[in-house]
């Protein structure tokens, strides 16, 4: 798989090349939300294009990360490390996080 930063750059450049938004961050979040909805609809209706819809979600997320100057690959790896260290358990019949998993805990 290509480097995350390169994918971010490509997603952003595609927006620029097509004259799409690269400055209105709230709009980008709304568009991302819409793509998540489309992916859910594809899944719930058992459509064969659910993978393509999930790719759209990823592309919007990569573009937004580039707009916000966030190294998404680094952040995903960091967050996955935190999630691995978290401990969960059932409290009153509901799964809950028992330990945060943050460094130093």
Task: Please provide the spans of the model-predicted regions.
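Flexible "arm" and connector segments at domain edges
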Residues: 1-105
